[in-house]
Amino acid sequence: MLILVTNDDGVHAPGIAALADSLHGLGQVVVVAPDRDRSAIGHALTLHAPLRADELRPGVFAVDGTPTDCVNLGIHGLLSSVPDLVVAGINRGANLGDDITYSGTVCAAMEATLMGVPALAVSLEGDTFASSEYRQAADAALFLAQKVSEEGLPSDTFLNVNVPAGRIRGIRLTRQGRRRYGDMVVEKMDPRGRKYYWLGAGECDFDYVDGTDCHAMHEGFISVTPLHLDLTNFRSFECLSRWSMTYSMD
């Protein structure tokens, strides 16, 4: 079994090392990851500049691009064949609710799914961790990767996995919740009197509704959320079909 591992925290992050080490128990692992932290870069793809990949050691490549670039380059350029599985992570910090639209880790799994390769994204709650917590998350990733390998996934579906720090009570199948951010823009003044801004500094407001990824994590459970490539809101069809859609160029 050939497994491609990537992330958005960068090739030197402790999370990807723990993940790759754990997945060696399932098959051959090749790491293709950004050469630096590319967190919150979403599904960005480099189209107007060349990419370079340096092999740091056998089976570990550092790419001067995004996580989505890494998946493309790994599948179409660096690996000897199409991988059987793509695993992204272990992300430093949970990717819950609205986070999935920003996360390079989640979007790496999405990119693999677009290419027809089964995939999962794995994130660990918090910001600083003991090595034992990374190992715990890596063990969970191995368990779920094996399940995906054995059982497969529905068409156009990938898994967003979030692991709580500390004691784990079990695993729950969840739906995407909401993780709303407060005032994300902080305005400052530099010594020359010019304004500058920091993004993403607001407090988070979690949706702890039962059945959501946020609630499962809050209760100490690993959250496994199946995500689909088709973002169509089918429930809105009835409402929108009542709109008058007659349109003329005259």
Curated annotation (Swiss-Prot):
It is found in: Cytoplasm. Its cofactor is a divalent metal cation. Its EC number is 3.1.3.5. It is an enzyme of class 3 (hydrolase). Keywords: Cytoplasm, Hydrolase, Metal-binding, Nucleotide-binding. GO terms for cellular component: cytoplasm. Binds 1 divalent metal cation per subunit. Transmembrane segments: none annotated. NCBIfam families: PRK00346.1-4 (NF001490), surE (TIGR00087). Nucleotidase that shows phosphatase activity on nucleoside 5'-monophosphates. This is 5'-nucleotidase SurE.
